[in-house]
Amino acid sequence: MSTKIIKASAAEPDVFETSISQALVELETNSDLKAQLRELYITKAKEIELHNKKSIIIYVPMPKLKAFQKIQIRLVRELEKKFSGKHVVFIGDRKILPKPSHKTRVANKQKRPRSRTLTSVYDAILEDLVFPAEIVGKRIRIKLDGSQLIKVHLDKNQQTTIEHKVDTFQSVYKKLTGREVTFEFPEPYL
């Protein structure tokens, strides 16, 4: 497989996605990640710019997500070197099924699985974003005007490795879901 991107419905990848795919191919040919990268591919990639800093979101197919996460730390380091310091995040390519209403109930015979609900997908995106850190707690603050602020508590042990990326995580999550989120590293409770 010379290309590392397989899009849904056989659409052609754009120039940016092709460059990401090419970078993955180069990493596969000349690095110690060869064995792990051989079977892996991505479904799409986006570049977003927030606060004068660009970040790259790479979507991976759900069955391959665990394999990507095994090598994610090294892969992110190599890709960030290649793309001159832009932050790189890997996210599983998940689908959200619409909430069944009275009109649509006849159309789909199957019940909507929990993993395809909006809440579940948004929570999973958050977990993918902060990987390899672990979410140890979450608080949702609902203000009087109805807006929500999600406070995510991350593992204190990972603070040194991901603290510099927290702003990127916030902006990427806001862009993907439209939800405000803040990250904290609280002292562990004993």
From Swiss-Prot:
GO terms for biological process: ribosomal small subunit biogenesis; rRNA processing; translation. One of its GO terms (molecular function) is structural constituent of ribosome. GO terms for cellular component: 90S preribosome; centrosome; cytosolic small ribosomal subunit; nucleolus; small-subunit processome. InterPro entries: Ribosomal_eS7, Ribosomal_eS7_CS. Keywords: Cytoplasm, Cytoskeleton, Nucleus, Ribonucleoprotein, Ribosomal protein. It is found in: Cytoplasm, Cytoskeleton, Microtubule organizing center, Centrosome; Cytoplasm; Nucleus, Nucleolus. Transmembrane segments: none annotated. Component of the small ribosomal subunit. Part of the small subunit (SSU) processome, composed of more than 70 proteins and the RNA chaperone small nucleolar RNA (snoRNA) U3. Belongs to the eukaryotic ribosomal protein eS7 family. Component of the small ribosomal subunit. The ribosome is a large ribonucleoprotein complex responsible for the synthesis of proteins in the cell. Required for rRNA maturation. Part of the small subunit (SSU) processome, first precursor of the small eukaryotic ribosomal subunit. This is Small ribosomal subunit protein eS7. It comes from Spodoptera frugiperda.
